């Protein structure tokens, strides 16, 4: 039985995610892609729930989804994204490390705006599985190349 009002919010939220899953809007994202040299070691990294497009057309300027992050970024390296993005942490939090090796805690209600060229990594505290709203911006704005696996460049 829920004692606090927040319990009802969690129940409604979990029900909403189940509906998205039943509608085919859930995808398990692995911690490394098919092009990674050690793809055979891939494991689930986040559960992604698509609020707009399951497969966004490249011409459409944005997409919105919920990420339920399950594990740290793999390896020791940084990564970037093919588009600028906004992330809003709804619950939990994570450590974000940047190219300067600055490590900052990003907690509940944190809002981050990032360019497509931003290099970073995400690490979790034990027992914390953050949930974020992620707004992916338009493709084609990354000026640098894709990040290299296992590096800080």
Place the predicted regions along the sequence by residue.
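Short acidic-glycine-tyrosine-enriched beta hairpin
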Residues: 98-117
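Conserved short histidine dyad/triad with adjacent acidic residue
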Residues: 65-80, 116
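Short, conserved beta-strand element in jelly-roll/cupin
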Residues: 81-95
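Short, small-residue-biased leader/transition segments that mark boundaries at the very start
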Residues: 1-3
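A short hydrophobic beta-strand segment most commonly corresponding to one strand
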Residues: 127-143
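A short, N-terminal "cap"/entry segment at the start of jelly-roll beta-barrel domains
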Residues: 9-63
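Active-site or metal-binding loop neighborhoods of secreted/extracellular toxin and effector enzymes
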Residues: 140-153
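Short beta-strand His + acidic residue motifs that chelate non-heme Fe in jelly-roll/DSBH
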Residues: 96-97, 119-126
């Amino acid at each position: 039985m829920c004692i606090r009002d927040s319990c009802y919010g969690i129940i409604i939220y979990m029900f909403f995610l189940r509906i998205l899953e039943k509608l085919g809007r859930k995808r398990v994202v692995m911690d490394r892609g098919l092009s990674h040299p050690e793809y055979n070691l891939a494991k689930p990294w986040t559960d992604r729930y698509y609020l707009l497009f399951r497969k966004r057309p490249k011409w459409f300027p944005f997409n919105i989804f919920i990420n339920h992050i399950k594990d740290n970024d793999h390896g020791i390296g940084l990564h970037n994204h093919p588009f600028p993005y906004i992330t809003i942490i709804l619950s939990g939090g994570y450590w974000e490390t940047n190219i300067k090796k600055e490590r900052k805690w990003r907690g509940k209600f944190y809002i981050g705006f990032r360019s497509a060229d931003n290099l970073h990594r995400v690490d979790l505290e034990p027992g914390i599985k953050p949930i974020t709203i992620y707004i992916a911006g338009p493709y084609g704005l990354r000026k640098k190349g894709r990040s290299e696996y296992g590096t800080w460049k």
